[in-house]
UniProtKB/Swiss-Prot annotation:
Main localization (coarse): plastid
Function according to Swiss-Prot or TrEMBL: DNA-dependent RNA polymerase catalyzes the transcription of DNA into RNA using the four ribonucleoside triphosphates as substrates.
Gene, per the UniProt record: rpoA
Principal EC category: transferase
UniProt note: domains: The N-terminal domain is essential for RNAP assembly and basal transcription, whereas the C-terminal domain is involved in interaction with transcriptional regulators and with upstream promoter elements.
GO molecular function terms noted in the UniProt entry: DNA binding; DNA-directed RNA polymerase activity; protein dimerization activity
EC number: 2.7.7.6
The protein's name: DNA-directed RNA polymerase subunit alpha
GO cellular component, one term: chloroplast
Catalysed conversion reaction: RNA(n) + a ribonucleoside 5'-triphosphate = RNA(n+1) + diphosphate
Region (Alpha C-terminal domain (alpha-CTD)): 264-339
Cross-referenced NCBIfam families: rpoA
Organism annotation: Festucopsis serpentini
Region (Alpha N-terminal domain (alpha-NTD)): 1-233
InterPro entries associated with the record: DNA-dir_RNA_pol_insert, DNA-dir_RNA_pol_RpoA/D/Rpb3, DNA-dir_RpoA, RBP11-like, RNAP_asu_C, RNApol_insert_sf
Amino acid sequence: MVREEVAGSTQTLQWKCVESRVDSKRLYYGRFILSPLRKGQADTVGIALRRALLGEIEGTCITRAKFWSVPHEYSTIAGIEESVQEILLNLKEIVLRSNLYGVRDASICVKGPRYITAQDIILPPSVEIVDTAQPIANLTEPIDFCIDLQIKRDRGYQTELRKNYQDGSYPIDAVSMPVRNVNYSIFSCGNGNEKHEILFLEIWTNGSLTPKEALYEASRNLIDLFLPFLHAEEEGTSFEENKNRFTPPLFTFQKRLTNLKKNKKGIPLNCIFIDQLELTSRTYNCLKRANIHTLLDLLSKTEEDLLRIDSFRMEDRKHIWDTLEKHLPIDLLKNKLSF
């Protein structure tokens, strides 16, 4: 972080992209400005956005590879220049772009002699390769080469325990971090009591999303983190009132969902996707990871099922019900339901 004094004045709060370029297929750069900010605010925003950009953005990568008739990852395969470990490292570097949730299967099946690149990966429709020229292996002899792959969308660095899998599959330490680097600098301008700060934010991504898309997603994630405090303020709750009180799961949530299902006669709930419910990105992502794509999928789950979803919180449950209550009777069902 760099702090400098510069001349100038900014009258209204605004943000904009002041520079954007594509250095390569796997390196995008963007530079953004936010101003005016009071003294100290630029640091607060800069630190929060940097952490969110580096740690909260989801990415898609290869998490497992299955070879046939390979005893261990340090083996060499006749007719292939690289060892199994080198092939795994090359697969780890493959950059993918997708909006998938859950685990998907992919594969490679080619005949040598030839170079194998990312272009040879057979992917599900929802996944695409950012750089098809990324190398995987070099077949030096006319052999058949097949690998089964597993693809997953996640966030951060996922380390898999090394085990001796009997079926020839090997875990890959996945790096689900589309943002490669973030830097911010603060410029102070003005005189005396009129001083304010300008925040410059630089973002480098791996090409699976643009810096602008990464900034948007990081901002949404930060907003979701603070929503519980906003709800607490709206409901007039205080820490003193709640610090010694335990709130058990409310059975009324499940009861209301049951009533809603009883009133769904003639309504094609399998045609109503959760994208239409205006859920927060956090709640939406939780449901998608649990393979809940439609309203029918959601209503088939019990409250206990929802609470078992990874990262799903009581606040998410309340938000889902509030959203159903707000939108379904009016916008989607077109008739008033009584609960």
